[in-house]
Amino acid sequence: MQESKRNFAAFILSHGRADRVYTYNSLRRQGYTGKIYIIVDDQDDQVDLYKQKYPKQVIVFNKAKAWEKVDCGDTIDDMRVVLPARNMCFKIAKKLGLTHFVELDDDYAYFGYRYEQNGALCESRIADMDRIFSAFCDLLDTTPIHTVCFAQGGDTIGGLQSSIWKQKVARKAMNVFICKTDRPFEFFGRINEDTTMYTRLGQEGYLTFTFVALQAHQLATQSNPGGLTDVYCEHGTYLKSFYSVMYSPSCVKIASMGGGGNGKMYRRIHHFVEWKYCTPCIISEKYRKVDAE
């Protein structure tokens, strides 16, 4: 698709944080000049505050109606999660006449670019987000990929020796979702919906990728009140991770992760994806046998 015919916008999903939509300012500071919409639900008691602060940029959806269409994976009567908002994005994009969009959480402090220099993994803040989003839209237009994402700030702990940095491109898909409106997909599970999406759909042949060199840096999950903070504090990471196990038991399991410091071990429960059981394994071209002439 020619860029002149492209209709792109950024969706920031938020709840109860009208005065703390950090992602909005981060996008503007880092060179994004396009349209931004704040996506909130009608059960948010700060809807009017959002509209005051972001006039003509707030889209309110009916959460109860959206909830009827989601697969949350349980019978808990609690809608304090982002799942319905995520699944509404494609519908909202279609209604707005968008061809592409990026879906973001509201707590991104900045977006960085990782690169190798003098034997170390370095980082600079992205200066032209318009160019980044345009390049990813080009990728979606020329491939059957469903979404391409930024890595998380903590993904490359370990620097050049981190396993994900060596991959360059990973099959996971979290945080910054660049999407094509006519290529929809769904999220599943009350929480950990992003992991459940890319593992379950990965088994069905959907293509989701993370470009590791681009990273979104978030505030600590439980340091920013509102959003999903209360849910995470109430249920912990064990329950969070187990939703993905329920949906994809053949390739996701519960494991502990973390490291040590000052002679102590700091570990927490997290999900672990067995990728060889999750997505099709593509053999490198270097192993191709050349036919004898």
Question: Can you annotate each of these PLM segments?
Answer:
Residues 100-105, 146-151, 208-212, 253-256:
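A structural signal for short, well-ordered beta-strand segments and their strand-loop junctions
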Residues 42-102, 109-121:
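Active-site-proximal specificity loops/subdomain of glycosyltransferases
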Residues 24-36, 89:
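Short, acidic, metal-binding catalytic loop of nucleotide-sugar glycosyltransferases
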Residues 37-41:
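Short internal beta-strands
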Residues 23-29, 47-56, 165, 244:
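Short, aromatic/basic amphipathic alpha-helical patches
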Residues 109-199, 203, 219:
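Conserved catalytic core of nucleotide-sugar-dependent glycosyltransferases
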Residues 1-29:
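N-proximal low-complexity "stem/linker" segments adjacent to membrane-targeting elements
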Residues 5-8, 18-20, 189-191, 195-293:
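C-terminal catalytic/acceptor-binding lobe
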